[in-house]
Amino acid sequence: MEAPQTRWLSGDQQRAWRAFIIGMTLLTDTLDRELRHAHGISLGEYEILVRLSESPERSMRMAQIAESMQHSRSRVTHTVTRMEKAGLITRCAAEGDRRGVEARMTDRGWDLLVEAAPTHVTGVREHFVDLASEQEFAAMGKLMNAVADHLLAVNPAFEDIRDNVE
């Protein structure tokens, strides 16, 4: 059987693709730098606090955190260890499953999230949302939903991720 012919990107498509990659890299680096400077936490740490804040009892299994962030369990474990040392999170055995581990946000973690959220939202608006018209932003959301739907269709293992986005 013959391999399918490669459909190369046009010049415009290549420029748009590179702009997307560069823009996302610069955006996440900038948001991370702003949070570190103002509050002493990374963007990844902030995102863990957000996920915990949205969970019942501000608690989640470590594996769920890793899945929702698309990070390895090892990476999340290292991040949570730092956060635990800073008093932002505690870890305990998962209820009903001694093999599982849950991370729970402390009051100190909650207070830091409440303090850092305006910095983060201001950065997201200034460096991303407010740069596009409502129509452009809606189109981008529609495109990213199409990307997610496609990737879910070809890899059902990603379904848990979609549940954490909606």
Describe the function of each predicted region.
Residues 1-39, 86, 165-166:
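N-terminal leader segment of winged-helix/HTH proteins
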Residues 62, 80-81:
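Short, hydrophobic-biased segments on the C-terminal half of alpha helices
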Residues 29-72:
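N-terminal helix-turn-helix DNA-binding core of bacterial DNA-binding proteins
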Residues 24-27, 31, 69, 112, ...:
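Alpha-helical linker/hinge and terminal dimerization helices associated
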Residues 2-5, 81-139:
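Charged, amphipathic alpha-helical coiled-coil/dimerization segments
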